[in-house]
Amino acid sequence: MTSAVGTSGTAITSRVHSLNRPNMVSVGTIVWLSSELMFFAGLFAFYFSARAQAGGNWPPPPTELNLYQAVPVTLVLIASSFTCQMGVFAAERGDIFGLRRWYVITFLMGLFFVLGQAYEYRNLMSHGTSIPSSAYGSVFYLATGFHGLHVTGGLIAFIFLLVRTGMSKFTPAQATASIVVSYYWHFVDIVWIALFTVIYFIR
C-alpha cells in the first residue's frame, strides 16, 4: 500500500513538473499582461503630463501624502510576491496543502494593501483632495484606483483558486492556474513599486 501511495504521489509530481514547459495558457497570460503594461504606461504618461502642466508645488496644497502609512502597506504587498511564489513552488511539487497555505497568506496580505489604500483615500478626501478638486487629484485617483482594481481582481482570482482546489482533487490544470495567477500578482506588485516611487518620491 505504501508503494502504491508513493507511486501515485510521484505520478502527480511528475505531471505537475511538466508544467515547467511553456504552454498556451502561460503564453497567453504573458501577452495579456504586456497589453496591461501598455495601459499603465499610458497612465504614467498622463501623470507626468499633468505634473508638467501644473507647475509649482506637486502635490498642490492642501494635499499631503502620508509616506509613513504608505511604506508599510507597500512592504506588505512586496512581501506578498514572495509568499505567492512559495505557493507556486508548492504547486510544482504537487503539494496542495502548501499551495493553499501560501495563497491564503498572500490573499490576506493583498487585502491588507487594499484596505490601506482605502484608508488613505478616506484621509485625502477628508482634507479636500478629490477627483474634481485638482489635476493632481484626478491623476492620483486614476492611477492608484486602476491599480487597486487590478489588486482586487487578483484577490478574486485567489479566492477562485482556493475554492477550486478545495472542491476537487489537485490536478496539473489547477497547478497551471496557480502559476498563471502568480504571473498576474507579480505584475501588479511591480506596477505598484513604480507607482509608489513616482507618486511619493518624484515630485
UniProtKB/Swiss-Prot annotation:
In which compartments does the protein localize?
Cell membrane
Family matches, as CDD domains: Heme_Cu_Oxidase_III_like
MF annotations from Gene Ontology? cytochrome-c oxidase activity
Q: What class of enzyme is it?
A: translocase
Task: Tell whether Cell membrane is among the UniProt keywords.
Answer: yes
Spans traversing the lipid bilayer: 30-50, 71-91, 96-116, 143-163, 179-199
User: What InterPro entries does the record point to?
Assistant: Cyt_c/ubiquinol_Oxase_su3, Cyt_c_oxidase-like_su3, Cyt_c_oxidase_su3-like_sf, Cyt_c_oxidase_su3_a-hlx
Identify residues that carry N-acetylthreonine: T2
GO CC terms, sorted: plasma membrane
Q: What is its EC number?
A: 7.1.1.9
Q: What is its main location?
A: membrane
This protein's membrane topology, according to the annotation, is: Multi-pass membrane protein
State the superkingdom: Bacteria
The protein's matches in SUPFAM superfamilies, at most eight in alphabetical order, are given as: Cytochrome c oxidase subunit III-like
Q: What are the entry keywords?
A: Acetylation, Cell membrane, Membrane, Translocase, Transmembrane, Transmembrane helix
Which GO biological process categories is it annotated with? aerobic electron transport chain; aerobic respiration
Catalytic activity from the UniProt record? 4 Fe(II)-[cytochrome c] + O2 + 8 H(+)(in) = 4 Fe(III)-[cytochrome c] + 2 H2O + 4 H(+)(out)
Family annotation (Pfam families): COX3
Could you say which protein family the record assigns here? Answer: Belongs to the cytochrome c oxidase subunit 3 family.
Listed name of the protein: Probable cytochrome c oxidase subunit 3
Protein's gene: ctaE
